[in-house]
Amino acid sequence: MANSKSAKKRAIQAEKRRQHNASRRSMMRTYMKKTIAAIEAGNKEAATAALVEVTPLLDRMATKGLIHKNKAARHKSRFAAAIKAL
């Protein structure tokens, strides 16, 4: 456990950040699951609409440092390729 005042503060901040990041990560995964479900259903219109929603979200999460920018690019590319193949 933290002994100094500054260490206690940092522990509180780290826990607050962890919870905030967990919430964002959960939201990101939910939007990705919606996109995957639309692709698997073969509904091109719904999949395209889901891609339009998830693309800026992935970019935002990469900018905030929640995921790496290459991971965001990889997901966007794979979603777009899967939708194009429908």
From Swiss-Prot:
SUPFAM superfamilies assigned: Ribosomal protein S20
**GO cellular component labels:** cytosol; small ribosomal subunit
Q: Which cysteines are joined by disulfide bonds?
A: none
Q: GO biological process: any one?
A: translation
Q: Which InterPro entries match?
A: Ribosomal_bS20, Ribosomal_bS20_sf
- Show the segment(s) annotated as Disordered: 1-27
Whether Ribonucleoprotein counts among this entry's keywords is yes
PANTHER family assigned: 30S RIBOSOMAL PROTEIN S20, SMALL RIBOSOMAL SUBUNIT PROTEIN BS20C
Q: What is this protein called?
A: Small ribosomal subunit protein bS20
Q: What organism does this protein naturally occur in?
A: Vibrio atlanticus (strain LGP32)
Gene name on record?
A: rpsT
